[in-house]
Amino acid sequence: MSRRMMKKPKLEETAGQGDPALPVYMLVGHGSMRPAYSVFKVDPYAGGAKGSPGRLLARLKCKHSKSFLPVRSKHGSWIVGVGGSSTKSRYGAEETIIFDTESHEVITGPNPGSTKPNPVLLAVGERIYAMARRPSINGRVDDAFDGRINFLPWFEVLDLSQAKVVGGCLTGCGWKALPSPAPVFPWGQNLHQYISRTTSDFAVRSYASVGCYILVSVSGQPGTYAFDTETEQWTTVDEKNDLPFIQLAIPHGPELFLGMSRATRAITAYKITVVAGVSLAIMEIPVLSDLPGDEEVMTTHNFLSLGIHRGFCSVTSWRVDESWDPPYLRAHIKMVAYGTEDFVEGRCIAVSKRWKQLFKIHDPVRTLDSPCVAGVFSI
């Protein structure tokens, strides 16, 4: 893969003004015949300076439609990928793959009990939770009437507390099926309805990990649901209101999260508190900026926290091929880091600085996914 940094960066502030250059890891997805993800390490504060392009650390050969998340455990700092498409091929059979950010080792983990395309992934301590993004089952419509349908384990957990890495493989652990999210997905329908309707009409649309609770809202029915990771029980914490953000809300500080607002489509902060697993309190805190080009804060779904006292970073990507049809060979990736003022409880988060970088990706051999950025993490 060839890659280079744009030589004319747009830069509002000089990099390195008291902010440490925290490492950011960016995953780029590759094409149809040889599915893989490239792991790059980039400096969010580089601002397009010469000699500081994204550095390729590893290429993870695994299935398409994988989800990734950062995990800190006794083993160190990992980026863990789970799930994938149901297509069987000799490329990327593993459904759990791990990248060690310190040793750059690629580790193979145990397969979940079911294949989950783009699953919802959340970490609570040293446990990784994987939930199907929408309910799914094995079998055909005709099988729904003779008992031959197998309900997949929609919700599973992988506990890393006793795991060991031996010869590039994760041992001493395995995925365990958890109680099906009955309040989340409509469990009361018959088998035929699960095939013909539920799989397309119900999907996880918002989620977050708050303390020992996993919060979920789904399309198709109102409300917010909580899974207690200690008791392994589901409860309804709000019967009428969904979580106010789209997809994942990421931790930004004590009880503080960043998410894409459902109402404004802007990156917004939220103070989220779960009270005894039975009620939910959410306070919205706007993210405001006086810098030109505020719309860039409004339009991206890939973003990460750099810490409550540093700010956050957004990443957008778009393909630049001459043809609209695949295969896709070229893409641009824009990374913008936002420095923020010290946060004061009850006030807005104010953006005061900004650094921009542009990467150009060209891969004529493996081709590129569209969009090509599969995730960005700081760990």
What is each residue range found by the language model?
Residues 7, 12-15, 25, 63-72, ...:
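Beta-propeller and closely related beta-sheet repeat lectin domains
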